[in-house]
Amino acid sequence: MITHLVWFRQDLRLHDNLALAAACRNSSARVLALYIATPRQWATHNMSPRQAELINAQLNGLQIALAEKGIPLLFREVDDFVASVEIVKQVCAENSVTHLFYNYQYEVNERARDVEVERALRNVVCEGFDDSVILPPGAVMTGNHEMYKVFTPFKNAWLKRLREGMPECVAAPKVRSSGSIEPAPSITLNYPRQSFDTAHFPVEEKAAIAQLRQFCQNGAGEYEQQRDFPAVEGTSRLSASLATGGLSPRQCLHRLLAEQPQVLEGGPGSVWLNELIWREFYRHLMTYYPSLCKHRPFIAWTDRVQWQSNPAHLKAWQEGKTGYPIVDAAMRQLNSTGWMHNRLRMITASFLVKDLLIDWREGERYFMSQLIDGDLAANNGGWQWAASTGTDAAPYFRIFNPITQGEKFDREGEFIRQWLPELRDVPGKAVHEPWKWAEKTGVTLDYPQPIVDHKEARLRTLAAYEEARKGA
């Protein structure tokens, strides 16, 4: 008997799952599914408890959905990726598996694991798929067959390549000829988990698809005007579903095209498409420069920046107690919800690196430990952009002023007051510099003074980068 095994990883869905669709194409084959939890590996990679809770819920939904199609989901748990190789080998042997199907992961540890799996399964046909991207790594290259290092040329080449051949979405599998089966007992991951707002981050696949449709219909066209203001619900909130594979980027692209037909010509929705292309850019980069997975800066000389070791400042930043309201409100949103608005990710990252002169890798690590949408490529790309260590990053002398950033993107302080109740009585725009208002009025606030002077911090950071740049 032909037996196909689908190995689920970061692709926890039925619709538009390339590996699952390929495994189910042969109607006479027996199809099994496998998921391997690796708690120690997840801890090493700083996976957040909220993301673990999302994965746990998605796994149980997937198990039920697969059972309705007649496909049993086998759940296994081992410490790490190395141990998972033996599990795949064991499951294949126990079930006389003839073909293994899986979707590629581009991180360095995951790629090494997959090489070992294929090496171990000499009598099993292994098929991998570029499922987590719209265009696979290698499809968008320079004229010299090199990876683009600047986003705008990559974007232009990506769009040109897309117009030459639009990747289609594949349908969810039909019920196997054997009929539906009873699902196995519910899955419980052996990893710290924390609840989250399912209204913002849906668990069920159909709910994620509905959220995508609603955003593309009602939000994508206004995204350019609303995306920078954290007090406004102007972003898609789809990042968590993309990070765990509850949605595919192809689903996002096709729904966007359906609702905003002029998007490829720069019409409504094109700025949100730009964000999808940034996601592709960072994934392609990570494939060609695996050192990015090892917390190495893309620009070599920036590794010589003399970072400050200041646990008190790092803790103040993590807890939202720096004395700069827009930074603190953003960090408290992250700690409370597991999510942070993208504009605020830039502001808080810039503050940690360029006001506190703390190593960007500390921030990268902390974000991953809190984010429900934690994604190595996107998170690393964002931090290296803010720290001026990455490819096509902000220049090192670009340093956000945390006061003017608050005034620009939360003018009346609506977002700040939502997350900093101790400042709710500070009127109007005074909320951006509450220490001045407190001194003027004689009111004592239960809120810290700024832990650094921005002007002095800026000069210190410029000097540190310029010193590191010598000899570059």
Model-inferred region functions:
Residues 1-166, 268, 463-468, 472:
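Trp/Phe/Arg-rich N-terminal binding region typifying the photolyase-homology
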Residues 46, 314, 445-448:
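Short coil/turn segments at secondary-structure junctions
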Residues 6, 14-15, 229, 321, ...:
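An N-terminal domain-cap segment
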Residues 145-299, 409-410, 414-472:
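Glycine/tryptophan-enriched, flexible segments
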Residues 21, 90, 206, 328, ...:
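A broad detector of short, well-ordered amphipathic alpha-helices
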Residues 233-422:
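Active-site-proximal binding-pocket segments
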